[in-house]
A protein has these predicted regions:
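Active-site neighborhood of divalent metal-dependent phosphoester bond hydrolases
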Residues: 55, 59-62, 67-151
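N-terminal active-site segment of His-dependent metallophosphoesterases
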Residues: 1-64
Length: 151
């Protein structure tokens, strides 16, 4: 469950600021973009949310963003897609929304990936059971996402 957090940072002196949003699980494209702008650790990098779902490298993108976030000058904010992912997997009352979510979201995304990887499409699980298994599988990823600031 998400608890809203806010980030305040005061910076003195000259600096270069790179702001990226809407990566949506396209890790390869994100890495190309960072090379194209010649990102270096001395730059300030803000990832303005929506780095999950839609693409076919969502779990890898989460891990990459989490590694970047360990740097002093990288700030990651939660977007609506991260909020939705967290809510869908941590609020039991939303478990029944998983089938609709799988229909609405593109053929990719980490929920779909784990759903198929764990063979949850066999019809033998309740929606609450499916939610729990996916949440357990993505425990570390959800922990990272749920602690991101929103501003």
């Amino acid at each position: 469950m998400i608890t809203p957090k806010h980030l305040v940072k005061k910076i003195k002196g000259d600096y270069r600021l790179i702001v990226v949003s809407d990566i949506h699980g396209h890790l390869d494209r994100f890495k190309v973009l960072l090379k194209k702008v010649r990102y270096i650790p001395e730059d300030y990098l803000i990832i303005l949310g929506d780095f999950v779902e839609k693409g076919d490298q969502v779990i890898g993108t989460i891990h990459f963003v989490e590694e970047l976030a360990k740097r002093e000058r990288v700030f990651v904010l939660m977007g609506n897609c991260e909020w939705a992912l967290d809510a869908l997997l941590t609020i039991p009352e939303l478990a029944n929304q998983i089938p609709e979510y799988l229909k609405r979201v593109s053929s990719n995304g980490c929920i779909r990936e784990v759903y198929h990887r764990l063979h949850l499409d066999n019809g033998h699980e309740t929606m609450l059971g499916i939610q729990k298994q996916i949440a357990d599988y993505l425990h570390n990823e959800i922990a990272f996402i749920s602690h991101l600031p929103v501003t």
